[in-house]
Amino acid sequence: MAKSPNNSAAQRVRKKVRKNVADGIAHVHASFNNTIITITDRQGNALSWASSGGQGFKGSRKSTPFAAQVASEVAGRAAIEQGIKNLDVEIKGPGPGRESSVRALGALGIRINSIADVTPVPHNGCRPQKRRRI
């Protein structure tokens, strides 16, 4: 006897939970290869996130300020749907998308309270990678 088709894929779809959070934190991780933006509430629970690679940019185009701007707009719009009005921005990393991602969040109408650089700096910890010779 043949098995009946299982609707497990249709059952797993969950409705998006709408939170009503006014204040949050935007974590911008700007590496040399990609930029990842995560918007959380004050406790650190993620409300929305986006990355340059997730927006269709591949290869070296992921590491451009424009790709970071597009990713910030996507994450910011999703956060506005959750009720975000004020953000503190924490930027980590030396990448090219640092400034453009903050500008994109401000252009969406989100009020930016503070901008902090939380790039980890070693107190002479691990040995760095060897210098690149071109």
Curated annotation (Swiss-Prot):
It holds the Pfam family Ribosomal_S11. The keyword RNA-binding applies. It comes from the Bacteria. One of its GO terms (biological process) is translation. GO terms for molecular function: rRNA binding; structural constituent of ribosome. Keywords: Ribonucleoprotein, Ribosomal protein, RNA-binding, rRNA-binding. One of its GO terms (cellular component) is ribonucleoprotein complex. The keyword rRNA-binding applies. Located on the platform of the 30S subunit, it bridges several disparate RNA helices of the 16S rRNA. Forms part of the Shine-Dalgarno cleft in the 70S ribosome. Part of the 30S ribosomal subunit. Interacts with proteins S7 and S18. Binds to IF-3. Belongs to the universal ribosomal protein uS11 family. This is Small ribosomal subunit protein uS11.
